[in-house]
Amino acid sequence: MAHYFVGDVQGCFTELQKVLEKVDFNPSQDELWAVGDLVARGPDSLATLRFFKSLGDSAKTVLGNHDLHLMAIHGKLKRDKPSDNLKALLKADDINELIDWLRQQPLMRELPEQQLIMTHAGVPPQWSLETLRQESALVSHALKQDDYLEALISQMYTDTAERWEPTALGIARLRFCINALTRMRYLYVDGHLNFDCKQPPQDCTDPQLRPWYEYTSPLRQSHTLVFGHWAALMGNVNDKKLKALDTGCCWGEHLTLWHLEKDQKITQKRLKKS
């Protein structure tokens, strides 16, 4: 069995199919792991969600910020913008089933035998594996509740800098987990998250900011970390234990697939902007 990991698809369904054809992906034998952000901006979020749902246990995805944003739009907590490119998905007959399927997806997945962890944006350097498991499980539990829109989705984001507080309770604790695992790029030296800078490290001019993966972390030493979210990196992190897979397909660049067993990246150029 082969394990394939794909970067942010964001509705680029044709490119996804093309890159899977290049490796002869067989869902009866192989697994497709996705770093999240299956939807938004690209031309066919509906087909993308339907495809991943149809794969059953052969698909392993985590939630990204755009997937959570879709839940907010569907729940009428946010308005969809033209740039979201979600109208066909929101009008689909099976939208409720697709949203329910998304709600079952976690914020982190792991392959223990490979010492590999996958999240959308990264892992806070302060967290141990046990903390990561615990905090992501709390969010997953909240997403599966009937009141998930009011209790979680309506309060999940903040644009103020947040720092991990082990004693935090309730929504503050859940919110840090969501913001860290789905939106994080840079941290201040005191551990606060920064949401403003999206540039690659070589272009960041604030001396107080460092990429999350440059901080000392027990998980950085022991595990391979697979993530997406940060298209500006274009996969360039210069560390064999970091697999940055968002290579900006929805922005006109390309989609990246990583074959775990061969440690090989396969790419598909964006075919058509929409």
From Swiss-Prot:
Q: Which GO terms describe its cellular component?
A: cytoplasm
Q: What is the E.C. number?
A: 3.6.1.41
Q: Per the UniProt entry, what are the Gene Ontology biological process annotations, in alphabetical order?
A: RNA decapping
UniProt entry tagged with the keyword Cell inner membrane: no
Q: Which UniProt keywords apply?
A: Hydrolase
Question: GO: which molecular function terms?
Answer: bis(5'-nucleosyl)-tetraphosphatase (symmetrical) activity; phosphatase activity
Q: Which Pfam families match?
A: Metallophos
- Classification via CDD domains: MPP_ApaH
Q: Which reaction does it catalyse?
A: P(1),P(4)-bis(5'-adenosyl) tetraphosphate + H2O = 2 ADP + 2 H(+)
Among Gene3D superfamilies, the record links this protein to: 3.60.21.10
Q: What class of enzyme is it?
A: hydrolase
UniProt superkingdom:
Bacteria
PANTHER family for this protein: BIS(5'-NUCLEOSYL)-TETRAPHOSPHATASE [SYMMETRICAL], METALLOPHOSPHOESTERASE
Q: Which family does it belong to?
A: Belongs to the Ap4A hydrolase family.
What is the documented function of this protein? Hydrolyzes diadenosine 5',5'''-P1,P4-tetraphosphate to yield ADP.
Name the UniProt record assigns to this protein:
Bis(5'-nucleosyl)-tetraphosphatase, symmetrical
Q: Which organism is it from?
A: Shewanella sp. (strain W3-18-1)
Higher taxonomy: Bacteria, Pseudomonadati, Pseudomonadota, Gammaproteobacteria, Alteromonadales
